[in-house]
Amino acid sequence: MIIDTHTHAFPDALASKTIPMLAAKADVTPHTDGTAAGLSAAMQIAGVDIAVVLPVVTKPSQFASVNAFAAELNKRDGLISFGGIHPDDEDIPAHVAEIAAMGLPGIKIHPDYQGVFIDDERYIRIAREALRHGLYIVTHAGVDDGFPECVHCPPERAVRFLDQVYEGREPAEPRIIFAHGGGNRQFSEVRKHLAGRNVYFDLSFIFAYADAEKITELIRAHGAERILFASDCPWGDPAEGIRFVRSLTLSDAEKEMILGANAQRMFAKYIP
């Protein structure tokens, strides 16, 4: 089973406006139209069995609509959607509990889109509440190519975030995922500060520019059992990502873990 753990889909009317805007901002060519149907089609072509959709709440007032759409996505075959919350949310404990009650497996946060540093107390509160409810947390990490001016989740701050969330008691099974290899375009800092910590890294988008040797070194430093295949579709091509992982100088068992076994273990109760 192949699971793409980092994808995006928008309501049809919103996708037609949002995808061209973000594509122009980051100077990338999208691989789908940004709709759920477009995402499902891309996954089928690539041979992906399940796509995990990660929404972003860019202002507190979007909480209800974003999470309602996430719940609708979870009714579609082959899609598992996280929920979202903004750090300025007026009632973080209640809304995290609501996400859990909706049956969503976790929460996506995006420090660059939300304009808050990852080690801010508001994100600490969100993460602690999420973990209390058994939810996963996925955060954008490193440079955002569309908004490169300020990096809100560099590896050094990510470490401070972890230390405050876990308070020295890291769980046996990781429940926090740092996207883009732990820090987009910051692999040296990731290896120095984050590699080896009890967290997952996903591989979203980085195969589009990073060479195989650097990514293999990162995987070796962190451990294949804590690496998740991800394309960032529509910004990355899942088929290209699968080919990239299969080309790495890793064992077949390590490639199997990355492409799906790790995520299958994480999301077992959400997979029919």
PLM regions and their residue ranges:
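A cross-domain feature marking catalytic cores of carbohydrate-active enzymes
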Residues: 7-9, 55, 83-87, 109-111, ...
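Mid-to-C-terminal alpha-helical segments outside catalytic/metal-binding sites
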Residues: 1-8, 14-50, 221-228, 239-272
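Active-site environment of divalent metal-dependent phosphoester hydrolases
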Residues: 10-13, 58-61, 88-91, 114, ...
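Conserved, mostly hydrophobic/aromatic
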Residues: 6, 43, 70, 99, ...
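Mobile, glycine- and charge-enriched loop segments
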Residues: 1-31, 67-84, 191, 196-200
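Active-site gating/metal-coordination segments in enzymes
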Residues: 49-50, 60-145, 209
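Structural motif corresponding to alpha-helix initiation and N-cap regions
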Residues: 33-37, 64-67, 89-93, 120, ...
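Catalytic pocket-lining loop regions of alpha/beta-barrel enzymes
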Residues: 105-106, 120-228
